[in-house]
Amino acid sequence: MERGAGLWLGLLAVFFVLTYLVPLEGRLLWQPDETRYAEISREMLASGDWMVPHLLGLRYFEKPLAGYWMNNIGQWLFGSTNFAVRFASVFSTGLSALLVFTVSWTVGRQLRQSLLAALIFLSLLLVFGVGTYSVLDPMIALWLNAAMAAHVFALRADRRTTRGVAWLLLGLACGLGFMTKGFLALVVPAIAVLPVALYYRQLKATLGYGALAALLAVLVNLPWALALSRLEPDFWHYFFWVEHIQRFAAENAQHRAPFWFYLPVLALGSLPWLGLLPGAMAAGWRARRVQPERFLLLCWVVMPLLFFSVAKGKLLTYILPCMAPLALLLAAYGRECADKLRSKVFDANAGINTAFALCAIVALLLAGSGLLPWARIYSVGEWPRIVIGTLVFAGWLCFAAVSRRSQGDRWALAAFCPLLLSLLVGQIIPQRIIDGNQPQEFIRRYETTLNQSRYVLSNHVGVATALAWELERNDVLMYDDKGELAYGLEYADVQGRHLSRDDFPHWLAKERLKGDVALLLLLDRRQDLPPGLPKADKVHRNHRIALLHYQQLPCCEQ
């Protein structure tokens, strides 16, 4: 084993455990994303139907099946826990780190360098932020990272058979990616591969091997696609036109954002390595003739970034697949700078981390001091959260200082800057944000009342899925707003699962004769209860969330 490699292997393992595993159970689930995916898998396991996704008992056609299956396995192994909900994301991120290690080892045959590349990947702010959060992006990123690795193997292959196997692996990865999140898994590899083929004049061969990969991707998806089409003929219409065309290209696309949206996301997501980012990208371009693998990695960063920037709909999680090739570029550039004793690069990176941590500390103090009333998000009694936040970013400052020099591998200790943030972020979040965005705590406080209610309703899909998850029931009704369940509510066999404001008083007068009714509302900040609601027997409110409890009436009061 190379000198120092054992130390970095141990540090990598400790970092993964502390950052990706230890905090999972202690953090409350966020709505709408985490509660949505938790409840979909809970309903799949409860019903035994792994083919047709349902949310609150309604058809839910926004994504294919593989991501749900991975989440199902997490809950099957670890039960109805927050750890189980997030396990698939962490597992996928861990496998992506293994792919980063494998690619680095394949290219350079340097064990220490490969371990550092994996550590850099796991420490990127965007990676550990999304990788410990229950969404499908870490899973699609895993398959796209596998496709990227297969592309590296194909580029380095010196025999036709080896190259063909690599392209088949790329096709398999794309097929599994399509099963996870759809056509994105086909588009991203295609646009990343194209400039490499053009620059190295391999277009004809690439098209041939690409056709082979595409055929395998189709064969991987054909069985479940046909089976789901037979069970739910409307799935492909909704999934293709609504989820892909409208989300990415239509004028009314979801999550619209300007073209430059991903530039600040990439900058912040690259912390604590932002100081190395420009040099790493430039080095990837300069090395295109002597190190084609680095140019390939550059294409896997830049081309998807451009594609997502052009798309009308944008979310910060979309560029997660760019981070594995970026980590490889950062590791290679960092090693070059360390070998050449170019300490100014590491000084700059440490300076950026220092400035970021100081700004975060100042922002925390301002948010709790009341000096800026419009920016105050902490109440008077929440000073312990501010103290914890200050300690978190003080830790960021300490590791930034340690990483300032290129001596040995000290520069790589910048990876530990976000360690305390990952461990303690749940203790920093203000209560008003917890109540509106992490309703588990509020629901558990009134769990007895909710469990005793014959009917439970909510005006927000995220809160409704949190109710369903905590109470283990899929019959939560929607009040007023339909949200992302609008399509599923159109089916004739689920009529009565949504109540408008006008219909609710009449429905309540009838149904509370059969049992208690609980209505959980998510309100805007400083919003009063909506007008026109029948008077509740009990009202429990905390910031943006309110529970209205209507007790059962005896039949004689009809």
Swiss-Prot record:
Write down the Pfam families for this protein, in alphabetical order: PMT (PF02366)
**Annotated pathway, please?**
Lipopolysaccharide metabolism; 4-amino-4-deoxy-beta-L-arabinose-lipid A biosynthesis
What sections of the sequence does the record tag as coiled-coil? Answer: none
Topology of the protein relative to the lipid bilayer: Multi-pass membrane protein
Q: Which InterPro entries match?
A: ArnT_tfrase, Glyco_trans_39/83, LipidA_mod_glycosyltrf_83
The protein's annotated catalytic reaction(s) are:
4-amino-4-deoxy-alpha-L-arabinopyranosyl di-trans,octa-cis-undecaprenyl phosphate + lipid IVA = lipid IIA + di-trans,octa-cis-undecaprenyl phosphate
Q: Which family does it belong to?
A: Belongs to the glycosyltransferase 83 family.
The job of this chain, per UniProt, is described as: Catalyzes the transfer of the L-Ara4N moiety of the glycolipid undecaprenyl phosphate-alpha-L-Ara4N to lipid A. The modified arabinose is attached to lipid A and is required for resistance to polymyxin and cationic antimicrobial peptides.
Q: Which PANTHER family match?
A: MANNOSYLTRANSFERASE YKCB-RELATED, UNDECAPRENYL PHOSPHATE-ALPHA-4-AMINO-4-DEOXY-L-ARABINOSE ARABINOSYL TRANSFERASE
For this entry, the protein name equals Undecaprenyl phosphate-alpha-4-amino-4-deoxy-L-arabinose arabinosyl transferase 1
Q: Species name for this entry?
A: Sodalis glossinidius (strain morsitans)
